[in-house]
A protein has these predicted regions:
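N-terminal and secondary-structure boundary signal
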Residues: 1-195
Length: 195
């Protein structure tokens, strides 16, 4: 085959391959309607209390089953200043890791992708995550740098891209930090899945 014969054939093959990829629909995030979210509020007077026991009480109130599931913990890590408390405290995350291991989760990961400061590991260090959470580096994924995959879209969009760590999780637990917010008044948990 000559070069003149090869180039048009290669172009046709590449176009056909690209077209077949575009015709495949990306997977859906869920096949069914959204389920109900369970919320439990359990009081701990300080971060030095037995947080695992408090969390276990909350999980039981919600009827949450974690055995054999891949769990992704999503803290709220924005930026760090020693004069503010805007991030999920490291002791909360450490307790949640221990809790889901005790409950038989097959895997527990921590995933975060801050929108303000882009060096997530430096931010995690400043917030005390690496020094407080056992095996932090092996548990943590920077969602800003994670590989992504498309899912079937909604609201008129053909598809959305999500971090593969998020898509691989059977259970995503928001460990949001309740705080005031200059636009919304209070953030509660509504913004925690943005970054």
């Amino acid at each position: 085959m000559t070069r003149r014969q090869f180039i048009p054939l290669a172009g046709i093959a590449a176009t056909a391959g690209y077209a077949s990829l575009k015709l495949q629909k990306p997977p859906k995030l869920s096949d069914g309607p959204p389920g109900n979210s369970a919320v439990s509020i359990v009081r701990a007077r300080s971060y030095s209390e037995d947080l695992v026991s408090h969390m276990l009480e909350g999980v039981r109130q919600c009827g949450l089953e974690a055995r054999g599931k891949r769990v992704l913990l999503k803290p709220n890590l924005v930026e760090f200043s020693s004069t503010t408390v805007i991030n999920t405290d490291a002791s909360i995350i450490a307790a949640a890791v221990e809790l889901f291991h005790r409950l038989g989760a097959s895997e527990v990961k921590i995933g975060e992708g801050p929108g303000h400061r882009r060096d997530t590991l430096d931010l995690a260090d400043d917030a005390g995550y690496r020094s407080t959470i056992p095996k932090f580096e092996s548990l943590f994924t920077d969602l800003n740098r994670d590989d992504v995959a498309p899912i079937q879209g909604f609201a008129g969009e053909p598809e959305f891209y999500f971090a593969k760590t998020v898509l691989a999780a059977d259970l995503i637990v928001s460990l949001a930090k309740m705080k005031t917010h200059h636009w919304a008044g209070a953030t509660l948990s509504m913004k925690n899945f943005f970054g």
